[in-house]
Amino acid sequence: MLHHFKKYILFSFLLSLIFLLYDCKSDTPATTNTIKTEAPKGMVWVEGKTFLQGAKASDKYAMPREKPAHQVTVDGFYIDVTEVTNAQFKAFVEATNYVTVAERKIDWEKMKSQLPAGTPKPHDSILQPGSLIFNKNVNAVVNMNNYTQWWTWKIGANWRHPYGPGSSIEGKDNYPVVHVALEDALAYCKWANRRLPTEAEWEAAAQGNQTDAIFTWGNDATILNANANTWQGVFPTKNESKDGFEFIAEVKSYPPNSIGLYDMLGNVWELTSDLFHVNYYKQLDTTSPILNPKGAAKSYSPSNPYQVEHVMKGGSFLCHDSYCASFRISAKMGVTVDSGSDHMGFRTVATPEMLSK
């Protein structure tokens, strides 16, 4: 099975086209604080706790990057009940006149600095503002290692036009915003007095009141379709939509977890503040619980060594057990900081200290 279908976004997709055309940080002691104010609208409180982060022993889908499981302690925090929606992001843009990465002119000189020396410049017709979208018209896949068969660089695709010119978010206020890069998410957080969750915080929230669960509802994989928006059928050519959705779903379309959080698994991937390092867990000192971990000190992905990646969590509507199986709490992948797509969004967190300012 291949587990890297979303590893590269714009940069990697363009690089593939070029080739085709040319032949613990844990510095602050945790107190698992319980001092809190009234929950902000649209957020819930996650109690500080010590829990097992990473792949559970019974998880047959677990990847090496999710191991070994290890004890971590996180302080309490607030987290959004849902992924940030189109309506919420629109309010931010209207208040700030912010322009997302997908809407900006592509800077080839900046991009070139992140590529192997000698990489030829793509044609100007390709270097246009846009984003990656899933190619729903893919009919056959010759080689599952070539993800460009089901991903398309769509000029004009962005958060306002998720499938390119002619598409719209009109009537979709309560759908998760997509085509947002890390920079876009951080700008929203600054405006809203929020921040992105750490990977440990994200897992603590996804676990809710459970302990050692693989999924947000427990360990029963047979009820996946009733609890998360994922791919059913044959990936990537046939989606039988047994869960009622072919692609992205409105937030709150599935049952919440035990503390009232929706869509922590499936629908869209969610950005975190942690840098992605494929061997991060293996490098940790696990003799005692790690206090408020903030992720790896540097980014490293052997399949994308030239760019910085952040951890994204939760999987998306494209996840299928034959390909990525990332509809699990411990699952994670890396995403480049300038990348967006039609299956990645984010949710935010806040601490009592942040809200008191």
Regions found by a protein language model. Give the residues of each.
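GGW-centered surface loops in extracellular recognition modules
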Residues: T37-P40, V44
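Short, conserved catalytic-motif segment at the N-terminal edge
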Residues: F51, K56-D75, P165-S168
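Short capping motifs at secondary-structure boundaries
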Residues: F77, F92-V101, A192, L355
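Short, solvent-exposed alpha-helical surface patches in non-cytosolic proteins
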Residues: V81, N86-V93, A181-A187, E203
